[in-house]
Amino acid sequence: MSIIDEMTGRGASEWPYPVKYGKENELSTDVLVVGGGIAGCHAAINAAKRGSKVIVLEKGATVHSGCSGAGVDHWGAAYTNPACTSDLEQAAESSARRRSYVNGMLSYITMRESYDALVDCEDWGMQFRDVDDEFAGSPMRDEKSKILFAYDYTTRVNIRVVNGAHVKPVLYRELLRLGVKVLDRVMVTGLLTEGGKPGARVIGAMGINVRTGEFFVVNAKATIMSAAQYSGIWVFNTELAGSAVHLDCPNNVGEGTAAAWKVGAELSLMERSKGPVHGSFGWPRFGVGSPTNTWFPCNLVDANGKEVPWVDREGNILKNVSDRTAFKAGATPTPDINDMIERGELVLPLYADLPSMPEDERRAIWGLMIANEGKTRVPVYQVFGEAGFDPDKDMMQAPITTLEVGGEGEGPPLWRSASAGGGWGSGGLVVDWDMKTSLPGLYAAGNAIAGENGGHPGAATTGRYAGRKAAEYAATVDSLVPDRKQIDAEKTRVYQRVGQTGDVGWKELNAGTARMMQIYCGGYKSERMLKEGLWWLNSIRESEVNRTYVRNPHELMRYIECLSRLTISEVIINASLARQASSQTLDFHRVDHPEMDPKEWAKFITLKLQNDRVVTGSLPLNYYLSEPYASTFKENYEAHASVNEMRSK
């Protein structure tokens, strides 16, 4: 294939699947689930258990799709497990007070149902306990329940998942057992509404098969949006290793959020992002030595074998490994580590010293956590093991230094991300205590929700909750016939570049959009730059979008993803214009509004599309505890959760 053929969109390799552009497939169901990740699977299972006929549309392969498609090593917020010593209600109140702009309602639901969701997985075939007594007698183990805990062995809130690598196949088998119709390789491109009108009841979705290009129309009484959060808005480079370390699954582009926006759903926290991020400079996730997260509480030593001291949250030295997992320790390697390097007290490189760890901790880090964490089971645990790495003998280099410009592995300041995780949530759909969005018939779960921050258990719990509520709603309404004009308009939009010549590939289109976001909506923003950014995005729509070539269904999928990222970028800029104040918590800096976190701006900014205009509004940070809701988490949960029983201690 010549370079000129590639540039003009000709000369693609022969496509291995039958191509059926334009062919329509019409289906009808009670509950439609958009996205078959963790949230979507739990939603579909729970809706089916409530008697609903359920269809799942998944862009990838549900058996291993989503951010946790390859596994999970620890399961957080399990406050109702039999060995937990922490009070759920107090923890929820404390979390809501400490973490503004994190949706406390979602955190509470996660705390209430996290352990239930884990035991659900156990019931379906994922044995998460230490049933073979490999860790008998270890401080991390509760002898009665045989549960292994992580991070804090006193409160016992985080559970190590012995067979977490198998979580998606377990969920997939349960979907099939319940008769859920799973349509893999179907990417949702738009939502159906009553009469085809924006702001009306959502009655299903439209999409394409990413292998054949055929069109799907699914009519549903209730729709659950569980497609993941958007990524690749500021950083786009698929060719360099490590490019996805901060982006979750690079296939998560936010097409669900974009589809909901276009029919008038209310979004919030869209102005939030963080940076700089690794981009193409990152190390493979957890594939280097570390003292945190999956590697916690591993010893660190310098090149001469000198141990890096650990401290608690008050700065007191923790002498023993066991002290690091004590209640309220807040254990971390000394924050003085970089100064110690500069003073010559620590000699680079540093290493994660697995051989010096107590045997149970060493086996837990390498054989349990690394072996079940989705990002590491194959690329780290399997590959390193096959190469001869032995955790009983070998240390692993830990790239910790700020002596290099920007720090080891960091990208430029303009490289940002909106990916949720680590107790940090950003933009998405606004929901109420029923997981219902601002549009009738549309529910949301997982990272599709604004402020969702619970990681894997957050997805599982909001998914099972939304599944129950959507099934309830579906039982009370009739099906409506989709609007033919809305379907035809969507088909015209998605197929407009099929068969057309062009000189722009989808990668160039995506990279160009990301570059505009870096320049005009980076770490420091102003009204003039943001409005200039909107102009440039519109210019891309008018020019490069109409010059993009689509040679097969795969490129059609990527092209439509570019359109979704364009839409998400426009929403982000509009949200950034609406917040006329800076915020340290949001990592949001307006140079023309430099005051940091003024009280009058301590609120959620909301946006929706109405009559082709962006309409902004606001919600109190605790809107879920304000009228018309009750004033406590417990009262609201018990009034809305639609759960008859809860597994508890």
Walk through the language-model features, giving the residues of each.
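N-terminal Rossmann-like FAD-binding beta1-loop-alpha1 element of flavoenzymes
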Residues: 31-56
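Core beta-strand elements of the Rossmann-like FAD/NAD(P) dinucleotide-binding domain
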Residues: 26-29, 212-222, 438
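Extreme N-terminal leader/targeting segments of oxidoreductases
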Residues: 1-31, 645-647
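Glycine-rich FAD pyrophosphate-binding loop
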Residues: 49-70
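Conserved beta-strand-loop-beta-strand element in the redox core of flavoprotein oxidoreductases
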Residues: 193-216, 223
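Glycine-rich loop(s) and the adjacent beta-strand/alpha-helix scaffold that form part
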Residues: 225-285, 456-469
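Long, amphipathic alpha-helical stalk/connector segments used for oligomerization, subunit docking
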Residues: 475-554
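Mobile, glycine/GP-rich and aromatic-enriched active-site lid/loop segments adjacent to catalytic centers
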Residues: 4, 123-190, 195-201, 269-455, ...
